Amino acid sequence: SFFYSLFKGTYNFIYVTIYSYLVDRTKMFFPFFFYLFLFICLSNLVGIVPFSFTITSHLNITFSLSFLVWWATCLLGFYESGLAFIAIFYVKGIPFVLVPFWALIEVISFIFRSVGLSLR
């Protein structure tokens, strides 16, 4: 049927996309990304209906989604890497004197990624 083909095509598209990034861990992350994609896609499709609006046009929804993804990234990073996750804030090749200042800038930019993502 048409709906089965539509669903299976969407399923395969998302699976192949995730597989290209997370080869051996696709099955672990697939449900999260699949339902996130469906939620955003279907929420935006509701906006096509006359006299309705998309819930993704509201800042509280987009901020909540980006904050959820940001926290999931942080928690998974600490779970997988432990304290070595903090190494993402260190940039190789900068003078030793600038390391604390640069790390502070990196932490602030990492925190504000969710805000920037929600404002898109």
Curated annotation (Swiss-Prot):
Give UniProt keywords alphabetically.
Answer: ATP synthesis, CF(0), Hydrogen ion transport, Ion transport, Membrane, Mitochondrion, Mitochondrion inner membrane, Transmembrane, Transmembrane helix, Transport
Q: Which residues form a coiled coil?
A: none
By its UniProt entry, which InterPro entries does this protein fall under?
ATP_synth_F0_asu, ATP_synth_F0_asu_bact/mt, F0_ATP_A_sf
* Disulphide connectivity of cysteines: none
Task: Name the Gene Ontology molecular function terms of this record.
Answer: proton-transporting ATP synthase activity, rotational mechanism
Transmembrane parts of this sequence: 2-22, 29-49, 59-79, 94-116
Task: State the GO CC annotations.
Answer: mitochondrial inner membrane; proton-transporting ATP synthase complex
Where does this protein reside within or beyond the cell?
Answer: Mitochondrion inner membrane
What coarse category fits the chief subcellular location reported for this protein? mitochondrion
User: Which topology term describes how it sits in the membrane?
Assistant: Multi-pass membrane protein
SUPFAM superfamilies this protein is in? F1F0 ATP synthase subunit A
Q: State what this protein does.
A: Mitochondrial membrane ATP synthase (F(1)F(0) ATP synthase or Complex V) produces ATP from ADP in the presence of a proton gradient across the membrane which is generated by electron transport complexes of the respiratory chain. F-type ATPases consist of two structural domains, F(1) - containing the extramembraneous catalytic core and F(0) - containing the membrane proton channel, linked together by a central stalk and a peripheral stalk. During catalysis, ATP synthesis in the catalytic domain of F(1) is coupled via a rotary mechanism of the central stalk subunits to proton translocation.
What family is reported?
Answer: Belongs to the ATPase A chain family.
Q: How does it assemble?
A: F-type ATPases have 2 components, CF(1) - the catalytic core - and CF(0) - the membrane proton channel. CF(1) has five subunits: alpha(3), beta(3), gamma(1), delta(1), epsilon(1). CF(0) has three main subunits: a, b and c.
Q: List the PANTHER family.
A: ATP SYNTHASE SUBUNIT A (PTHR11410:SF0)
- Name by which UniProt lists this protein: ATP synthase subunit a
The organism named in the record is: Naegleria fowleri
Which gene specifies this protein's sequence? ATP6
